[in-house]
Amino acid sequence: MQETGLRNPTNGIETSGLKTSGTVFFNLTEPQLYEEAIRRAEARISAHGALVAETGQHTGRSPKDKFIVRDASTENEIWWDNNKPLSGEHFEALYEDFKRHAESLDLFVQDLVGGADPENALPVRVVTEYAWHSLFIRNLLIRPMRSELKSFVPQMTVIDLPSFRADPKRHGCRTETIIAMDLKRMIVLIGGTSYAGEMKKSVFTALNYLLPAKGVMPMHCSANEGSEGDVAIFFGLSGTGKTTLSAEPSRTLIGDDEHGWGPHGIFNFEGGCYAKTIKLSREAEPEIFATTERFGTVLENVVVDEHGVPDFDDGSRTENTRCAYPLHFISNASETGRAGQPKNVIMLTADAFGVMPPIAKLTPAQAMYHFLSGYTAKVAGTEKGVTEPEATFSTCFGAPFMPRHPSVYGNLLRDLIAEHEVDCWLVNTGWTGGAYGTGHRMPIKVTRALLSAALDGSLRTAQFRTDPNFGFAVPVAVPGVDGTILDPRSTWADKAAYDVQAERLVSMFVANFGKFENHVEADVMNASPQIRQAAE
C-alpha cells in the first residue's frame, strides 16, 4: 500500500479500518484532484475551468436507502418513525464487505471539519473512491490549515464507494444502494450511488444527532448578518427562496444551508455551498453564476456542449443540477462562519393555496408550531390536467436529516427565541390573488420590501391585525407596499372561495400536527390555526 500527501503520521488509512493494494491520496489540493479526476475519466473541465461530473442513475439523495444502526445507545434517542433501523450485525457485515471492496481501489482522503465553532466542531475524515468526490467534500466542509493536518484526529469517518453494491439479504437493506450510519462509532458507509450530496448530508445528520445534547440547536437554514451585527436566520424548504433571499449584497452571508445556534451565537456547519443551477442566470443570481466559471467549482449533472459551455436551462439529465464551491467564492461571505445571537428568524413558505399573508409575526409558541409543521406547497408539474397544489409538511424544515424527535429541536428553538428575545416572522413567497392556476406568484419586490422592514426593525412598530385563520399578527400597512396584498382574502375576487380554501389548508395543518400533540406543551397546541370566518 502506497500513501501520499499530507497527514497525521499516526493516523493513516488503517485507523479507518481500511487497507488497499492501491494508492491512498491524503488531502490533495484542487489542481491535484483535477489531474486525478481527468486522468481517471471521472470528469471533464468546462470552458470556464469548473470540473464537470455526472452521477449516473442517482441524481439526488436516496432517503429510502438511508439507515441508522439501532443499538442500546440509539434505541431511545432516535425518532424511529422517521429513520430506518439497521441491526449492528448487518452493519458489521456491511463494514467488512466495504473493507474487502476497498482492498483493490485507489482511495482519496480529506481531513475536514464540520462546524465553524471550535467548541462544537466535528473533525471528519472522508474517504472516497472518486477524486471528484474528494474535491466536492473539500469544497463543502471546513478545511483545517495545512499545518493542522499533521495533528488531525478524526472523530467521524465517512467512506463513500459508489462501485460497491449492497446485498439486501446480507446487509439488511432495501436495494444495492445504501447509506448506513453507526452513530455510536461515528462511521458512515455510502455505496451504490455517485450522488455527492449524500456525504454532505451524512455529516449534517451526525451533527443534528450530537449537538442538541450540548444545548446547541442544529438548523437546516441559511443565515446572514447586517452591518449593525443584526443576524437573521432563514428556514425554508426547497423552492421557497431561502438561498435567493439570504444572498443580499448589503448583508454578510454566513452560510446557505446548515447552521448551529448555541450560547455564543450561530455558526456555519460548512465551508461551502451546494447551489441548484437549473435555470441559473447571470442576471438573476450573478454571484452564484460567477462561481460556475471558476477553477475549483464542481458542476454536478450540468449539461455542457461540445465546447464545454454549460447549459443551465437543460434539465434533461435531472432538474437537480448543482454546483459546489467554497464559501470564499462569494464576495460578501463571512470569513469566520460565525456570528452573534440572531435578532430575527424568518420561516419561508411558498403557499400555493393563496391563503397565507406575505408576512406575519409569530409568538415563540407559534414559531415552534410552524417550525414543527415545516409547511410549503408543491405546484403541478408537467402532467396533463394536474392543476391542484400539494401541501408538503417537512418537520423542522428538514425532516430527512433530523435523527432525533422533532420536539427536541422545537423545544430548543422556542427556548432560544425566548431567551434572546428574537423576532420571528413567517414569510409567504407563494401565491396571492388566488391559488396556483388562478392567482400569481408573490412579487419578489414585495417580499424583499417586507423582509427589509422586518430586518431593519421598522416593522416592529407597525399596526397589526390578527389573522382569522392562523391567529398570527399581520401588519396592516408597510411603507412602499400596497396594503391590499397584506390581506390575502382581499386579493381574491371570490371571497367565499378564499374562505373554503383557508378552511381546507387549516384542516391540513391540524391533521398533520396530530402526531406532535403528546410531545408539545399547551401553549404550542393553542398556537394551532382555527377557522374563524372573516367578515366581508
Curated annotation (Swiss-Prot):
Q: Where does Mn(2+) bind?
A: K201, H220, D257
Q: Which GO terms describe its cellular component?
A: cytosol
NCBIfam families, alphabetized? pckA, PRK09344.1-2, PRK09344.1-3, PRK09344.1-4
**Keywords, in A-Z order:** ATP-binding, Cytoplasm, Decarboxylase, Gluconeogenesis, Lyase, Manganese, Metal-binding, Nucleotide-binding
Q: Which cofactor does it need?
A: Mn(2+)
One Pfam family in the UniProt entry: PEPCK_ATP
Q: Give the protein's function.
A: Involved in the gluconeogenesis. Catalyzes the conversion of oxaloacetate (OAA) to phosphoenolpyruvate (PEP) through direct phosphoryl transfer between the nucleoside triphosphate and OAA.
State which Enzyme Commission number(s) the record gives: 4.1.1.49
Give the organism the record lists: Chelativorans sp. (strain BNC1)
* Uppermost EC category: lyase
Tell me one GO biological process term.
gluconeogenesis
What residues does substrate bind to? R61, Y195, K201, R322
Q: Which family does it belong to?
A: Belongs to the phosphoenolpyruvate carboxykinase (ATP) family.
Which residues of the sequence carry a binding annotation for ATP?
K201, H220, G236, L237, S238, G239, T240, G241, K242, T243, T244, E285, R322, T447
Pathways involved: Carbohydrate biosynthesis; gluconeogenesis
Please give the name of this protein: Phosphoenolpyruvate carboxykinase (ATP)
Q: Gene name on record?
A: pckA
* Gene3D superfamilies (UniProt xref): 3.90.228.20, Phosphoenolpyruvate Carboxykinase, domain 1, Phosphoenolpyruvate Carboxykinase, domain 2
Any binding details for the cofactor?
A: Binds 1 Mn(2+) ion per subunit.
Under PROSITE patterns, the record lists: PEPCK_ATP
Question: Catalyses which reaction?
Answer: oxaloacetate + ATP = phosphoenolpyruvate + ADP + CO2
Q: Where in the cell is it found?
A: Cytoplasm
Using the record for this protein, list the coiled-coil segments as residue ranges, or answer none.
none
Give an example GO molecular function. Answer: metal ion binding
